[in-house]
Amino acid sequence: MKQVVIQPAARKVLRKMPVTTANRILDKINAYAADPYAQANNITALAGRPGIRLRVGDWRVIMRDGEVLDVLKVGPRGGVYD
């Protein structure tokens, strides 16, 4: 399992959202960290910039994958890509 680092901006968004939604997102992040090749992860490479996108319902998680899984942004669909 990879180590997960959540950046302050993403942590702030997670704290402000409903607990059930935040737990769903954190569960999906941890599932990806445990098995990056599972098809249920719903991961896509970002177009035009480095990083990957994790889809959790109407929420998107922008991450950088390497030795450490770096969670950069969490936001609603559409607004997270700015």
Feature annotation, model-predicted:
Residues N30-L54:
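A short, surface-exposed loop/turn module that caps and links secondary-structure elements
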Residues M1-K12, K16-N23, V56-W59, R64-D82:
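Enriched for short, Lys/Arg-rich terminal
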Residues I29-N30, L46-G48, I62, R77-G79:
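Short, intrinsically disordered/low-complexity patches at protein termini
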